[in-house]
């Protein structure tokens, strides 16, 4: 999603978010990621000012103190950025890819099922189709990507081939590199 993102050309405008809308965003995040309930006020303090950045292709970025913490495509779900995920990685559903998939993952490739179901990978059974998950790598501590599952964990384990997770945002992509003043 962010391979071709260019912060100088794609950003069309910024708007401060009202506190009532900010509460709604926090509620949507907690609904989508229930484990965030305990830490949501630390991640997005009540008196802080969220800013919405409108970009090309109906993409919205949400920043806090100049740091992109959330993004949303059109009316889709609000998705945490890796910068937010690194602050509380245990609050999100995680999968792990084996060592062989790391270089492909960090170059923006989609995650293939064999990298998830192999010995070094980890694919929890409760993952459903069209669910956003955090992708970690074997032997690494920090989350490396955020992806959207293309099928359930059960289906992935049965087929054992093809694309399992669409790589939406990864370490080193243009969203990760974007620094706002």
UniProtKB/Swiss-Prot annotation:
It is found in: Cytoplasm. The keyword Cytoplasm applies. This is Translation machinery-associated protein 20. Associates with ribosomal complexes. Belongs to the TMA20 family. Residues 92-172 form the PUA domain. GO terms for molecular function: RNA binding. Keywords: Cytoplasm, Protein biosynthesis, RNA-binding. Involved in translation. GO terms for cellular component: cytoplasm. It comes from the Eukaryota. One of its GO terms (biological process) is formation of translation preinitiation complex. CDD domains: MCT1_N, PUA_MCTS-1-like. Pfam families: Pre-PUA, PUA. The gene is tma20.
């Amino acid at each position: 999603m962010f391979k071709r993102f260019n912060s100088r050309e794609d950003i069309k405008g910024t708007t401060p978010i009202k506190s009532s809308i900010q509460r709604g965003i926090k509620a949507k995040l907690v609904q989508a990621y229930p484990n965030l309930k305990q830490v949501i006020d630390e991640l997005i303090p009540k008196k802080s000012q969220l800013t919405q950045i409108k970009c090309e292709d109906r993409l919205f970025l949400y920043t806090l103190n100049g740091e992109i913490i959330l993004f949303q495509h059109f009316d889709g779900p609000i998705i945490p950025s890796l910068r937010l995920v690194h602050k509380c990685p245990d609050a999100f559903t995680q999968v792990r890819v084996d060592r062989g998939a790391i270089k492909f993952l960090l170059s923006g490739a989609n995650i293939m099922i064999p990298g998830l179901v192999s010995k070094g990978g980890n694919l929890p059974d409760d993952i459903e189709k069209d669910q956003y998950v955090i992708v970690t790598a074997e032997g690494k501590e920090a989350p490396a990507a955020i992806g959207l599952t293309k099928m359930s964990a059960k289906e992935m384990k049965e087929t054992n081939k093809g694309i399992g997770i669409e790589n939406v945002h990864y370490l080193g992509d243009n969203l990760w590199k974007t620094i706002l003043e």
